[in-house]
């Protein structure tokens, strides 16, 4: 295999693909370059298929520290578990490439993407998608389609294709679309809040203010309306169609000889299918009417047992696995036919109907803010905890040399018992991180941009029958309100579904787990009354036209507004939590911040211990934030700090070099004695200048509070050096 290099300049990306250069024993591999970024993508396949009817695909996106000329921090100097960005990127690549595999392909496949050189301007998610796609397309697995990824930003009201990371900082839209020449496969979107300065009419300027206009700022959530979103997706789709066609044309000559792996045939025993349809249609319809997954599974097992018993009594073959497969196929048909033929869903709802919702707030007395949000048989207990700046999550990005901090976190937990399964509760998996990230993207635009503390939302999914991430968003918004976070708007989330037979199309509002499993689309939308703040869409049927997308968005808006009505009613009945911390914000002279901190932090530590408060200081602006559980102690701490700040500035006393003074021993340390001089200023008597002979233990000679005679040897500003008369004798 000869090395082949393909360069493609498209959609504001300059890409170089180097094939047959690295990892030649893999099924497919590529070295991908964009700017200074270099990624290695490799695909491997096990030629022994699994027995289960699913594709065992594993995607790993990995960032190496050396790619940014860094050594891993901490005690372990090698890469360990993946960070959140790596996990979320792995998930995006998986969701984008999984639909490319042919039906009946049940062979274990691993796709590994490794960043070996970084670039501070390169979008690593788009780069990872393109590198993984190239390695898969040219592999001996013989995938027939290539995908392309496009990120769309909006800067100064203009849509921008594949903005650099610097441009993304200026954008109010983050839209990632992945698709092939024929279809859109995956969409992720989030709105990005910004601050806007209001224009003040000249005749509104108060002459008493000296004719100087006031600067008024307010936060724009930058929600996206339906029409603007469809336009942005259409803008991305056009670029994807062109790019994927070019990728296929350029990569096809590099494709390896196919392995010729056989695909599992999806055989349906037509006779058994007809038998079940004729004799058990009512039993199946009754079984699927149970909304809970565990109950439905139990009822379907009973139907299966009845079928097997009947077949055996008639002298027919009754293979348990075969009956289960055919019964599951018939169940799916029943669910879909009810929707398309009658406009009725398995639980009896209409297509546009939202499940019953109940909301309880601040049900946990020791928590800052809480909400128990129940929609049908999906239930989330969401809590909000408020902290200081020091509570922010610190992390690193391979594209940035500086340590990052995250002061708004959403953690989503999905225990097995929420779906009736006996599972050990361990560390969060990819799905939990993904759902938490979706909820964060939905809520972040309404959190004050300049929020000066830290917020942690935790969603405990107690029961799940679809849309648990959307319940997290709804419960999270109300938990934030319960914690008295000054949010711009309430946010609600709703999951939409789609069922089609190619001719007829039914859009479903607020889908449950059964409809997610047997439907053709999972479309999660969250936002305020003004528009969409976050969206996630995975399409199973191969594509979606813009007309159907518009219908889904309109129906989602109706469902979202209905949920917001209920949330607003719950907010009116909300009572403040007794556990909320008391906070005080005020300003002092920035030059006095050093006095508040004190030497080596002694003063601020004393304040924290005495008044049981936490303190955040802004050294540049003189801002002070106090937090504590006792309102009176917080007020007393404020008074104490203001007293220090308002105290007159003492001028540093000028001591006469060579003159003898009597001071007090303030503190004894290993290297000397801190002496309180006349007028209260401190000076250092070094251990080497206590006596002519070597002194090993100062505590044998002096005690704190003792008077001590010293001679000033030197003074440089506030730094005063001393010696004893004994040393100078």
From Swiss-Prot:
Q: Provide the E.C. number(s) assigned to this enzyme.
A: 2.7.7.8
Q: Where in this chain does the record put each KH domain? A: 581-641
What is the main EC category here? transferase
Annotated ranges, domain S1 motif? 658-725
Q: Where in the cell is it found?
A: Cytoplasm
Q: Which positions are annotated as binding Mg(2+)?
A: 516, 522
> Which SMART domains does its entry note?
KH, S1
One GO BP:
RNA processing
Where this protein primarily resides, as one coarse class? cytoplasm
Range of residues in the leader sequence: none
> Which GO molecular function terms does the record list?
3'-5'-RNA exonuclease activity; magnesium ion binding; polyribonucleotide nucleotidyltransferase activity; RNA binding
One GO term describing the cellular component = cytosol
Q: Which reaction does it catalyse?
A: RNA(n+1) + phosphate = RNA(n) + a ribonucleoside 5'-diphosphate
Under the heading Pfam families, the entry gives: KH_1, PNPase, RNase_PH, RNase_PH_C, S1
Cross-referenced CDD domains, in alphabetical order?
A: KH-I_PNPase, RNase_PH_PNPase_2
Instruction: Name what cofactor the protein needs.
Output: Mg(2+)
Keywords recorded for this protein, A-Z: Cytoplasm, Magnesium, Metal-binding, Nucleotidyltransferase, RNA-binding, Transferase
Q: Does the keyword Nucleotidyltransferase apply?
A: yes
**Function summary:** Involved in mRNA degradation. Catalyzes the phosphorolysis of single-stranded polyribonucleotides processively in the 3'- to 5'-direction.
Family listed: Belongs to the polyribonucleotide nucleotidyltransferase family.
Output this protein's name.
Answer: Polyribonucleotide nucleotidyltransferase
Gene that produces this protein: pnp
């Amino acid at each position: 295999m000869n090395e082949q290099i393909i360069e493609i300049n498209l959609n504001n990306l300059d890409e170089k693909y180097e094939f047959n250069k690295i990892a030649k024993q893999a099924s497919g591999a590529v070295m991908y370059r964009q700017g200074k970024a270099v990624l290695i993508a490799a695909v491997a396949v096990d030629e022994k298929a699994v027995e289960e009817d699913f594709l065992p695909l594993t995607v790993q996106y990995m960032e190496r520290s050396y790619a940014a000329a860094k050594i891993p921090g901490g005690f372990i100097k090698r890469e360990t578990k993946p960070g959140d960005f790596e996990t979320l990127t792995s998930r995006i690549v998986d969701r984008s490439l999984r639909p490319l595999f042919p039906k009946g392909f049940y062979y274990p496949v691993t796709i590994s993407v490794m960043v070996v050189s970084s670039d501070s301007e390169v979008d690593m998610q788009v780069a990872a998608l393109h590198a993984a796609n190239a390695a898969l397309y040219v592999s001996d697995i013989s995938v027939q389609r290539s995908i392309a990824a496009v990120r769309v930003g909006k800067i100064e009201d203009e849509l921008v294709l594949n903005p650099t990371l610097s441009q993304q900082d200026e954008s109010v839209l983050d839209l990632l679309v992945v698709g092939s020449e024929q279809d859109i496969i995956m969409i992720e979107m989030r709105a990005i809040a910004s601050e806007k300065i209001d224009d003040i009419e000249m005749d509104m300027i108060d002459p008493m203010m000296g004719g100087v206009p006031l600067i008024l700022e307010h936060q724009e959530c930058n929600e996206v309306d339906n029409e603007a979103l469809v336009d942005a997706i259409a803008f991305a789709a056009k670029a994807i169609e062109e790019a994927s066609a070019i990728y296929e044309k350029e990569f096809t000559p590099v494709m390896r000889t196919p392995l010729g792996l056989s695909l599992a045939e999806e055989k349906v025993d037509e006779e058994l299918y007809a038998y079940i349809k004729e004799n058990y249609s009512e039993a199946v319809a009754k079984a699927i009417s149970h909304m809970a997954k565990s109950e439905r599974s139990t009822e379907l097992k009973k139907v299966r047992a009845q079928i097997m018993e009947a077949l055996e009594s008639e002298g027919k073959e009754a293979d348990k696995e075969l009956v289960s497969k055919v019964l599951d196929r018939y169940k799916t048909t029943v669910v879909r036919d009810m929707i398309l033929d009658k406009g009725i869903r398995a639980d009896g709802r209409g297509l546009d109907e939202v499940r019953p919702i109940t909301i309880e707030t601040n049900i946990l007395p020791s928590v800052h803010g809480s909400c128990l949000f129940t929609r049908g048989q999906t239930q989330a207990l969401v809590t909000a905890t408020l902290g200081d700046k020091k509570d922010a999550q610190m992390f690193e990005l391979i594209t940035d040399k500086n340590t990052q901090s995250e002061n708004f976190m959403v953690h989503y937990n999905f225990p097995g018992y929420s779906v009736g399964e006996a599972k050990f509760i361990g560390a969060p998996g990819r799905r939990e991180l993904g759902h938490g990230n979706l909820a964060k993207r939905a809520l972040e635009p309404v959190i004050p941009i300049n929020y000066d503390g830290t917020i942690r939302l935790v969603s405990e999914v107690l029961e799940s029958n679809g849309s648990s991430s959307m319940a997290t968003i709804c419960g999270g918004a109300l938990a934030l309100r319960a914690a008295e976070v000054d949010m711009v708007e309430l946010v609600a989330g709703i999951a939409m579904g789609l069922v089609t037979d190619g001719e007829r199309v039914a859009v479903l509002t607020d889908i449950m787990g059964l409809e997610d499993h047997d439907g053709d689309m999972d479309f999660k939308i969250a936002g305020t009354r003004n528009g969409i703040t976050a969206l996630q869409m995975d399409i199973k049927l191969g594509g979606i036209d813009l007309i159907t997308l518009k219908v889904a968005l309109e129906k989602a808006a109706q469902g979202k507004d209905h949920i917001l009505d209920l949330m607003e009613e719950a907010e009116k009945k909300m009572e403040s939590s007794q556990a909320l911390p008391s906070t005080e914000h005020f300003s002092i002279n920035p030059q006095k911040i050093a006095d508040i901190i004190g030497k080596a932090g002694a003063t601020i530590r004393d304040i924290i211990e005495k008044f049981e408060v936490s303190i955040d200081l802004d050294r540049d602006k003189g801002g002070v934030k106090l937090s504590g559980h006792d309102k009176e102690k917080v007020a007393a701490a404020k008074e104490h700090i203001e007293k220090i700040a308002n105290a007159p500035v003492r001028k540093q006393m000028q001591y006469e070099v060579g003159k003898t003074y009597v001071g007090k021993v303030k503190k004894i340390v290993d290297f000397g004695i801190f002496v309180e001089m006349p007028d209260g200023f401190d000076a250092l008597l070094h251990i080497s200048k206590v006596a002519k002979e070597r002194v090993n233990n100062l505590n044998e000679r002096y005690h704190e509070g003792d008077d001590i005679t010293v001679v000033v040897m030197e003074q440089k500003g506030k730094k005063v050096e001393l010696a004893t008369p004994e040393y100078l004798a």
